[in-house]
């Protein structure tokens, strides 16, 4: 049934100050999809869901005098907590955007109503 096909896309941006390495950040982003799924999405073939993330924990010094730079990394055995927290944060962000949005006009003057009008 085409009415039940997945429609729409979402972009999820995860920012953290945890000192995550590239591989760790990719693992965290995979768990961000759990928050999306908790809100009812099934991420079908037609959806264009994008997950990007960054950490600002390990800055790069501006001085050229330092030949080497020490980086910190988050302990692997504590990543389960981060996975759980990112899923909760994504879920909460989606629910907040749904309940706090305002009605707005769309194409050809069609009004897209907000859930906040009915709550």
Predicted regions and their residues:
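A structural signal for small-residue-enriched, beta-sheet-centric alpha/beta enzyme cores
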Residues: 1-119
């Amino acid at each position: 049934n085409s009415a039940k096909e997945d429609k729409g896309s979402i972009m999820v941006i995860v920012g953290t100050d945890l000192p995550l390495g590239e591989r760790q950040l990719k693992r965290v982003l995979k768990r961000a999809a759990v928050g999306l799924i908790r809100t009812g999405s099934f991420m079908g073939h037609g959806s264009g869901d994008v997950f990007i993330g960054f950490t600002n924990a390990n800055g790069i010094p501006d001085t050229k005098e330092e030949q080497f730079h020490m980086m910190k990394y988050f302990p692997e055995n504590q990543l389960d907590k981060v996975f759980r927290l990112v899923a909760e944060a994504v879920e909460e962000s989606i629910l907040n955007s749904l309940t706090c949005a305002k009605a707005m006009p769309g194409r050809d003057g069609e009004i897209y109503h907000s859930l906040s009008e009915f709550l």
